[in-house]
Amino acid sequence: MESKATASGSFLENIIGKPVYVKLFSGILYQGKLESIDGFMNVTMSQVSEHYEAEENGTLHKYPSEVFLRGSQVLYISEK
């Protein structure tokens, strides 16, 4: 039996390797390159900067290595 990708699955597959925003329920916004994502919305990113609520609020932290975000904390993912 052949499975079909959902619209959200296609979107997520298409943005791997691209710049994205990932916002957590805590209000922290991560901006960086999406390296991987799984079915639980666990996210790995590189070249990441961390902001509170919006990019305009300034950078809280820049990460020199990859960042892992737990899917249960992800509010949304958007393409930059």
From Swiss-Prot:
Domain Sm residue range list: 7-80
Localization recorded for this chain is: Cytoplasm; Nucleus
Q: Which GO terms describe its cellular component?
A: nucleolus; P-body; sno(s)RNA-containing ribonucleoprotein complex; spliceosomal complex; U4/U6 x U5 tri-snRNP complex; U6 snRNP
> According to the UniProt record, which cysteines are disulfide-bonded?
none
The answer to keyword Nucleotide-binding applying to this record is no
Under Gene Ontology molecular function, one entry of this record is: RNA binding
Principal subcellular localization: cytoplasm
> What's any GO biological process attached to this entry?
maturation of SSU-rRNA
Q: Which UniProt keywords apply?
A: Cytoplasm, mRNA processing, mRNA splicing, Nucleus, Ribonucleoprotein, RNA-binding, rRNA processing, Spliceosome, tRNA processing
Q: Which InterPro entries match?
A: Lsm6/sSmF, LSM_dom_sf, Sm, Sm_dom_euk/arc
Q: How does it assemble?
A: Component of the heptameric LSM1-LSM7 complex, which consists of LSM1, LSM2, LSM3, LSM4, LSM5, LSM6 and LSM7. Component of the heptameric LSM2-LSM8 complex, which consists of LSM2, LSM3, LSM4, LSM5, LSM6, LSM7 and LSM8. The LSm subunits form a seven-membered ring structure with a doughnut shape.
Q: Which family does it belong to?
A: Belongs to the snRNP Sm proteins family. SmF/LSm6 subfamily.
What is its biological role? Component of LSm protein complexes, which are involved in RNA processing and may function in a chaperone-like manner, facilitating the efficient association of RNA processing factors with their substrates. Component of the cytoplasmic LSM1-LSM7 complex, which is thought to be involved in mRNA degradation by activating the decapping step in the 5'-to-3' mRNA decay pathway. Component of the nuclear LSM2-LSM8 complex, which is involved in splicing of nuclear mRNAs.
Q: What is this protein called?
A: U6 snRNA-associated Sm-like protein LSm6
Q: Which organism is it from?
A: Kluyveromyces lactis (strain ATCC 8585 / CBS 2359 / DSM 70799 / NBRC 1267 / NRRL Y-1140 / WM37)
Q: What is the lineage of its organism?
A: Eukaryota, Fungi, Dikarya, Ascomycota, Saccharomycotina
